[in-house]
Amino acid sequence: MIRKFFRLLSILVLCAALFFGYQTLEWSNKYKQGHDEYEKLQAQNTPENESTPENDSDSTKELPFCPDWTALKAENPDIVGWIRMDPTCDYPIMQAQDNDYYLYKGFGRSYNINGSIFLSSVNSSDFSDKNSIVYGHNMRNGDMFGDNDYYYEKSYCLEHPYFWIYRENGQYTYRIFDVMRVTDATEAYDTQFASDDDFETYLNDMKNQSSYTIPDAWPSKTDHIVSLSTCVAAHGSTRMIIQGKLVNITDYSGDDIPLTSLTTQNQNSNATPDSSEQQ
């Protein structure tokens, strides 16, 4: 009787091991497939002669990079930009009418465990709002915004002070001015402001919520900013937000575009806030 019991127990243990092994392999394949989709896109849109970016505190210019906008838009017209940020962030930015749409869809609009980097549905697609919100998952393997955790250290931020958003008209350079760890109910997700003075009040509130600030990069009430939002592992309603102010726009021929051009675009924007899900 005892022998039969242990034989049955051994069979059950073996079945459990096989089941969990299969589950682990299945999840591993999902992560690999998600990673591979973006790796292919990156290879297709990175010049062969591109070298390592020099992201130092005295440089607002990244190395030449120009995605194949014609091909990208032909495959998925929801693309509104491309973001690059040290150490590994290098992804297209999507936008849909519903923020849930790209939570678990890749660039090809099929299931991808990584989801997509995407601009909030309430924002203008040209990044002309005072505060544009860009979401991305915090993946354990470092994909998407998974390496943003490096920016919890102020020293790392000082060594890597910029991120870049590319649009069809050129390169938008943002300098990071604060990092915060907040709840998803924070005012950090406000995108529309009645006046520049209201935006200045918002900035003061962000200073109070920040884990740290970069004083010499702090924006004025006339600036435009981008907030990069990702979830914090094991803390369901907690978010990490990295905020950067726009400091330069350069077209693909190397000429600067006046920052005031964004103000004109924003005056023609009809975006209105809603209560979409946040990452």
Where are these regions (language model features)?
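Solvent-exposed, non-transmembrane regions of membrane-associated and secreted proteins
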Residues: 17-279
